[in-house]
């Protein structure tokens, strides 16, 4: 990706979607603050959160590492996903790729399964559903983001469990 002062997480997502490995795979999606921005819930996204199936993780991780430096990731006491990698674009924007998401709280590990069938496409990008990120933000302990997405869904008649 060419250097530019206007690099955004969404612009990085568009660039990634054109890489052969990402273009061939239908088993990854965009979430996190980039999804919140796409839905008009925040003005700016901080980073780019990508979720994929465990089977796709290695291929997509290799594609990212061919273009971007991979950052060291320390073991986290709460977040214990099967697969997790963090990369950094020269603009400073971080890209997190995760699969087999698991969270440990009070000695209980909760696994979350990514469902590619729930993806929706806009601007030729695969977006995760708001409902998926309500579940993830609940697991991650982010009540403000849960509230934003829940209100968004309720205002549009989208069922939230």
Language-model segments: what does each one mean?
Residues 1-29, 147-150, 154-161:
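Helical scaffold of the NTase/Pol beta-like nucleotidyltransferase catalytic core
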Residues 16-55, 59-61:
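Active-site nucleotide-donor binding segment shared across nucleotidyl transfer reactions
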Residues 26, 93, 123-125:
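A structural micro-motif
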Residues 26, 65-78, 117-118:
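Short secondary-structure junctions
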Residues 35-36, 57, 102-104, 132-134:
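Short, solvent-exposed loop/turn segments at secondary-structure junctions
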Residues 43, 78-81, 109-112:
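Short solvent-exposed loop/turn micro-motifs enriched in small/polar/acidic residues
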Residues 69-105:
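Conserved catalytic core of two-metal-ion nucleotidyltransferases
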Residues 105-161:
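Catalytic cores of NTP-dependent nucleotidyl/adenyl transfer enzymes across multiple folds
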């Amino acid at each position: 990706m060419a250097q530019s002062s206007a690099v955004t997480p969404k612009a990085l997502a568009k660039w990634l979607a054109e890489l052969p490995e990402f273009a061939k795979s239908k088993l990854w999606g965009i979430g996190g603050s980039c999804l919140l921005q796409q839905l008009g819930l925040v003005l700016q996204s901080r980073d780019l959160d990508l979720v994929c199936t465990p089977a796709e993780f290695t291929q997509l991780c290799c594609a990212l590492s061919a273009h971007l430096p991979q950052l060291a990731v320390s073991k986290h006491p709460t977040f214990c996903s099967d697969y997790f990698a963090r990369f950094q674009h020269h603009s400073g924007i971080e890209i997190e790729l995760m699969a087999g998401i698991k969270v440990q709280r009070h000695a209980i590990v909760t696994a979350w399964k990514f469902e590619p069938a729930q993806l929706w496409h806009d601007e030729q990008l695969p977006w995760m559903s708001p409902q998926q990120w309500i579940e993830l933000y609940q697991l991650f302990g982010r009540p403000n983001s849960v509230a934003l997405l829940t209100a968004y869904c309720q205002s549009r008649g989208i069922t939230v469990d």
